């Protein structure tokens, strides 16, 4: 039988439980979210519902998610009631789908995130940078997994050349044949929690099965015409790995809408900010007609990739809009950093 320590319990969460000062509550980790019911890791596996007080008091992003540690009221039956969510060490978020401006948490208390990119026409460096930005806000270590290497034997170097400038760890693998699975497992230390992120059809379920050594996750087909996949993972679930780590599999993400602040783009686009600091004038707008602009000079010399810079401008613009929607007052109080970048 696994203990709470096996699921990642540590002093951080113990302090959160003690702060509640409710000795009748016990700790548990959320293993799966089935909508109206959550599966918990307790001394015995239990299903749980949320208390009415928690449902009405918490914002949607603060309700229990897969990976969360929670305080639970246990009963003699198979069920339990979640009374509180313990303070998180990390959360990976995006803007929720739809017209409302809401934060959606995809996974919590994660140490390392594997961002899967398929080595086919679905590969997208701009999309990858969106993931890296969100992970930088979460303080989660990113590892890019270049999957389906068996389909791109002659083109692997081409894809690697697009990842290397991002200064991120990467692993080339073929989940279908298990190639690279051992390297991925070595990247998850005992007690650490990892999550698989990526679009539908990139092979997350196949990789989950390879890492677990069994066909636990359903695997779906990919459309030939565009290499797009259908959702085969319908819910988020946390699994225990043989080496002592844990793995969260997630449904495919069709669109990663950003959630954050434009001023935090400096980590993902360190090169752009470094060039901006070299401009002749401190009030440089980095437009094509600016004199002494280091960014324009780098674009002309191809030192700075135009697609990379355009993606920076797109993400910066998207985050500005998000900021004004979260709080319209922010529109009058923008910081000067990214205000200097023109959209050209």
PLM regions with names:
Residues 9, 18, 133-136, 150, ...:
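Signal for well-folded cores of large energy- and translation-related assemblies
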Residues 2-4, 24, 59-76, 87-106, ...:
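Helix-rich effector regions associated with P-loop NTPase G domains
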